[in-house]
Structure formats: structure tokens, C-alpha cells
């Protein structure tokens, strides 16, 4: 079967000049799979981003370029629905929370699992997206701060389901 929907979370998209850049406007084209092409061709899609360089931020590119906090060269790829969030993962968790309410079961990861995953990724070489440091942080947020949002979404989702 063919997919009915494409979803992109924190996935770098090419800017108008065809270059893939990270949040610091560094060219990462050689390290980036060109999946934004799929989104250009597919009729139904969701993009979740936080900095302007992600697939879907083409929907708001003219506003991204006016911001001092976001990238200078926004992604050009547009999506059917765009979710903006301070941290892309938080936007994805929000989507999963909404799907949980539709499904009648909490589909969100718990904070213990998420903390273990982040620690494993950092221990395997991942770095924080803001500082570039190998630290237990996500987009500049300390692990506890980052997990607080997931914990609250789990709490709210559980309350709404029961």
C-alpha cells in the first residue's frame, strides 16, 4: 500500500539555493538525505519544526527570514499542515498526544524511556542542536527541562483519557 500521509519531524530541508543547512547556517548537504523531494511530490503531509531549516517551514519562509533568532536561509519545502514548536520533539509529542485521544490510549513515550534514549544517543556521539556539545540536552534545554514538557503532556493525556 501507498502511504496516506508523510510526517517530518526536525528534518532538514533545502533552502531556495538547494543547500541543506543546520541551525547555525552551516552547509550539511553532504550529510543529509534529500527526502524533502518526497514532500514536494506528495499531496498530504505534516511538517514539525522549530528553527526554520526544517521540511515544512517553507510555509512560513518569508517570516522566518525576518526573525533574528531563526535561520537566514529557511527551508523551501512546504507541507499541508505545519506544527511549530520551541523544540520540534515537543511539537511531535503534541501530535502524538492528539492521536492518543483519538485512539483512546496514551501513545506517548514515558520520560524514563526518553531519558535513556537521549543518553544513549549522546553516548554514541550525538550533540545538542544548539551548542553542538555532547551533553544531555535537547536544543539547549537541560534534560530535566526538556522532559518536563513530555511529562506534562503525558499527565494531561492520561487525565483526558480517564
Predicted region positions:
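Short acidic/glycine-rich loop or secondary-structure boundary segments that cap or lie
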Residues: 15-18, 53-58
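Hydrophobic/aromatic beta-strand patches that form the interior of the parallel beta-sheet core
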Residues: 5, 44-48
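Acidic-enriched, low-complexity/disordered segments with a strong bias for Aspartate over Glutamate
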Residues: 17, 25-27, 36, 40, ...
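A structural motif corresponding to the C-terminal end of an alpha-helix
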Residues: 34-45, 99-103
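An acidic, phosphate/nucleotide-engaging active-site surface
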Residues: 1-39
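Fold-independent oxyanion-binding glycine-rich loops
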Residues: 9-12, 48-51, 98
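C-terminal functional extensions of proteins
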Residues: 55-162
Amino acid at each position: 500500500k501507498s502511504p496516506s500521509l508523510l510526517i517530518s519531524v526536525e528534518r532538514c530541508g533545502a533552502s531556495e539555493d538547494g543547500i541543506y543547512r543546520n541551525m547555525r547556517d552551516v552547509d550539511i548537504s553532504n550529510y543529509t538525505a534529500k527526502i524533502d523531494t518526497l514532500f514536494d511530490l506528495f499531496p498530504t503531509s505534516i511538517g514539525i519544526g522549530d528553527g526554520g531549516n526544517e521540511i515544512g517551514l517553507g510555509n512560513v519562509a518569508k517570516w522566518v527570514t525576518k526573525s533574528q533568532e531563526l535561520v537566514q536561509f529557511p527551508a523551501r519545502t512546504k507541507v499541508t499542515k505545519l506544527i511549530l514548536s520551541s523544540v520540534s520533539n515537543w511539537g511531535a509529542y503534541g501530535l502524538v498526544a492528539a492521536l492518543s485521544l483519538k485512539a483512546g490510549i496514551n501513545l506517548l513515550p514515558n520520560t524514563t524511556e526518553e531519558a535513556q534514549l537521549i543518553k544513549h544517543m549522546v553516548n554514541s556521539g550525538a550533540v545538542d542542536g544548539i551548542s553542538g556539545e555532547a551533553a544531555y540536552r535537547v536544543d539547549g534545554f537541560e534534560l530535566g527541562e526538556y522532559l518536563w514538557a513530555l511529562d506534562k503532556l503525558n499527565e494531561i493525556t492520561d487525565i483526558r483519557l480517564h
